[in-house]
Amino acid sequence: MKLIIAEKPSVAKSIASALGASSRADGFYEGNDLLVSWCVGHLVSPMDAGGYDEHFKKWRYDDLPILPEPFRYVLAPGKEDTFENLRALMNRPDVDTIVNACDAGREGELIFRLVYEMAGCRKPVLRLWISSMEDSAIREGFSDLRPGADYEALYQSALCRQKADWLVGINATRLFSVLYHRTLNVGRVQTPTLAMLAERDAKITLFHKEKYHLLRLTLDGAEAVSEKFTDPAEAEQAAAMCKGAAVTCTSVTREQKKEQPPKLYDLTTLQREANRLFGYTAKQTLDYAQSLYEKKLLTYPRTDSRYLTSDMAETASCVIHLAAKLPPFDGCSNFFPLVETMISDKDVSDHHAIIPTMEIEKVDIKALPLGERNLFLMVCCKLLCASAEPYVYEAVTATFDCGGHSFTAKGKCILSEGWREIDRIFRASLKEKPADGDGGTLPDFTEGQTFDGAEVAVTEHFTQPPKPYTEDTLLSAMENAGKDNIPDEAERKGLGTPATRAAIIEKLVAAGFVERKGKNLIPTKAGINLVTVLPEPLTSPMLTAEWEQKLTEIAKGGADPDIFMDGIRTMVQEIVSTYSCISEDGKKLFAPEKEVIGTCPRCGQPVYEGKKNFACSDRSCGFVLWKNDRFWTSRRKELTKKIATDLLKKGRTNVKGMWSEKKQATYDAAVILDDTGGKYINFKLEFPKRKVSSDGRK
């Protein structure tokens, strides 16, 4: 009997249904000589430093670096029952083979292997490797199970990734947190990503905009533009020379251009476009795609390929025709799909591009949640576009002379809309404008053609700063980090993997190093300060991209895991030995920002709120309002920020409900600041005057 272990319950249910294991028991499905059970994500994790030695539970510089060998592992809190269920199933006498059906990728391999090792299982392992949750794909994959040993290199790559993250994260986080007296989360991939955000923010801050001018020449049905003028007087002088002058068309060039269909989606391009069109975060897009995968509507989402394999040509053709029947695509012109343009066996490693499945003909798309529906239609649109004809147009450039100055007008004439028709119809359904082009149609200008009485206007413009990163542009930057320093034949470049980049962004936001402002991702002051104090090995996108490339080489059997880990350990040791102390100014970088609540009545410096007082920022001044001053505690009133603010601003404040010990009752009065310049501040009470009645009584 085979025991199949999936990564999550929903996947196990689909596998069990497809393979005929229809009987549900406690923690597994059974039937057809199969048992199907599940993990719940990472059941087994590396032990925290404190687990190796009680001494490590407290963060101290003298304990660093912490370099465990061998690494130890523990069960994730709250998942003990799930693990014990799997161990019991593995140990059943009638189970002779274990099938690893966790996600077909690096992390899925790690999740299964760590459970298998901790359970002490030694039974043979086979690997289910599929890219779709369709019943047919599951059955086909099950008929072609591979020996688990074929994926040993992938497992070693996953282990190296996990150990490297632990070593860098634990040691660097403890080191800089101890030095700066604040928890500073440092990560092997998240910190270089933060560095890119900080660098872009600095460029925006330091950008100096420059003014320039353009001359705009109005012609029959078109507008031609001059070169830039940096001197406004020169621009006005040129405009004066052109106004009313004759205009001559000096050249007209026409060039037929062809824009090939876009490639299919991998996860990163799907996340980027979903951010542009709908504002979805990378994590939201991954969650929607994962849900659609588990509903059998999309293929495996965590892929870095944008092509299909040759054996998928027939299936792809069928899916294309099904997608073309869905609104809004059913309004497109008839076209014959060019499936061969999407096929490239050499560009598919673990998983092919993301496409819809044959299940779409069985599902009511309108019944899907909005986010999933939008994403699903995006993938359908991309499949149709990728298999359509090229977009063909004629690019027209006309140049003109007026008053001795040259002007240029650009336009285009569409010859065949091709794939852009599908894209245009989809965007129209979203009320989105089509992608920008290079101008509209130009009149039929001819060389030597002349125009009388030129109309010229001077327009003012400014150079623009770099734009803040959005999730779209940050994902692109992460994907391409280190690209120029890694050989072209390398399979993976960049920071992280398609499957991990969303989580990296979320960690930076959760740690308070990055904040979302609309679609923009902006580093916080703490984030910028962190990048400032960290050494280059921890902030360099290029170095981290090279590490990611090494992990890929390990997964392919082309690099030694031990050499990789030795390099990580050496780097950690060097960082710890280099950073043993910091300057006094450095200690202030992560001090919490204090709110100014008023001005000191003695010296005029700002007054800040502290834990126990409201004190002048100039310590030599000595002005302090103590929160536990007996004046307030005896009257059972709290010296609040509002009361302190009023006292500093007006010298007095009205306070209600003060307690009188003598009368055993509350009363209202004005409290007046009575500062005599001594060590302690005095206060006076002023009671409202009672009104005198007409008979003289109060």
Label for each model-derived stretch:
Residues 30-32, 218-222, 401-405, 663:
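Short strand-coil-strand connectors
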Residues 71, 93, 135-219, 254-258:
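C-terminal or mid-to-C-terminal helical accessory/interaction module adjacent to the motor/catalytic core
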